[in-house]
UniProtKB/Swiss-Prot annotation:
Gene Ontology BP term (one): bacterial-type flagellum-dependent swarming motility
Family affiliation: Belongs to the flagella basal body rod proteins family.
Predominant localisation class: other
Keyword Ribonucleoprotein: no
Protein name in UniProt: Flagellar hook protein FlgE
Domain of life per record: Bacteria
Gene name tied to this protein: flgE
Amino acid sequence: MSLYGMMRTGVSGMNAQANRLSTVADNIANASTVGYKRAETQFSSLVLPSTAGQYNSGSVLTDVRYGISDQGGIRSTSSTTDLAIDGNGYFVVQGPGGSTYLTRAGSFVPDKNGDLVNSAGYYLLGAGADEAAGGLTVAGLNVVNVNAAALPAEGSTAGDFTVNLPSTDQAPAAGGYNHKTSLISYNDKGEKITLDVYFTKTGADEWNVSVKNAADGVEIGTTVLNFDPTTGDLVSGGNVAVNLGAYGGQTLNLNLGGSTQRAGDYTISQAVINGQAPSSIKGVDVGNDGAVVAVYENGTQKVLYRIPLANVASPNRMTVVSGNIFLPSAESGDVRLGFPQGDGMGKIMSGTLEESNADIAQELTDMIEAQRSYTANSKVFQTGSELMDVLVNLKR
């Protein structure tokens, strides 16, 4: 072993420990960075060929491994567009140049156009609300936009109203009725029209149905229900054409099919009429299955997108890019897409963020180890230098 070889080995060791200290510094600096994945310096020896009686000292090589597949802790936030993944998978995001990447940094907020973008400037990509998992491709994804249009007014055109009329009821006095229920419908401007539905028994198995506008008492629809005397099932008259034309609406077909005349109380098993008033968007929720849902002021919910997750065979072999994003490579394998809670993917948690997976206690321990190792390698170099001085002084 030559003295120069000894000194070169010491320098190699110092460089290796300096690299380790650099990764430790990065980890400590990013201990609070959302979605950050810890870097770790790995060492391997470089052995030089030796001859009999002569040892040639080698050196040490370093490589940096990122714990991309290691999940960090999950903490709660107050924003529904802050997203974390519990389990496998990565969000698919788009950079300013249009390139796509993967990330676990889910601190998304709407920009001025309503597009969801994270703190590093990468836009979240999603699939259509009705997209099937088998048809997912990265090229087919679009930037998720939460500026959903307001719900337009929609006039009522159809409804289902199912009741049980007590078979023991008697026909009321002239001008009276047995039962009354109020229903809400809408004209074409989205204005509410309250409908009063009157049931009046007119025979053993016959009932008159009258639909009136509650505001003025005008009858705008009528029918006669006939029931089977043995089973109590509806035989005829199960549809009422309610004319809302005088109130700015359309003809509402109110279906009474399924109604019965049997023993018991007057009960309603179904009362649904379509139509709606105009409504503005109130907020956006994201489900565990990745559904991005617009919530409107009137309580209506509408699925805007479904957020898919991506994965690769070897996540730790992906290329790390600034902004806590990852670029799949030949070593990591091809990108595979799937929806959360299926296809081997984890679930999306709204109102949470994944923290850095760097542990301060571990990093400080590694820093002390690297510092001591650096000092030891410097002693090797120093000893080699001193021996070289001895060799030079032999000439004197």
